[in-house]
Amino acid sequence: DKDTTGLMVLGKTEFSLTDLSEQFFERTVERRYHALVWGDVSEDGTVEGHVGRARQNRTVQAVYPEGEEGKHAVTHYRVIERLGPVTLIECKLETGRTHQIRVHMQYIGHPLFGDPRYGGNVAVTGSPGGKYNNFLRNCFDILPRQALLAKTLGFKHPKKGEFMNFDSDLPSDMVE
């Protein structure tokens, strides 16, 4: 996603690109993300529901819990740290749908901090005078994008066949 920081993989050759694409298709690539989400996420959990284009706005995705539209999507999440009005979580994807983490977290009432497409900026723009209002305005100045990091990426090397695992640190704007 645009404005997501962290790791990504590219195939340098057609062979590598094809091999990596197959690994993503077969869901053997390990991907974990860190996200700051609104609210106190009380428990670790799993969000499961079809994800597809929203009926009212075709530029965003929506969750269809009965599976009437979209494609099957599963996101596992665990709480890393509670930080007042936001919670730092880790997400592990079983599937890889467009905006999957963003739409799944919105669906369970915990949109990503700073995500205007999925309700992550409403806490400031929609609640003037709130308890954390000045603090949050400063946070939006420091982190003017969705708080989502591609934290770990693991896959089999296309030529050597060995499993490779990469890890990235939280960017400075998410640490502040």
Each model region followed by its residue ranges:
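RNA pseudouridine synthases
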Residues: 2-176
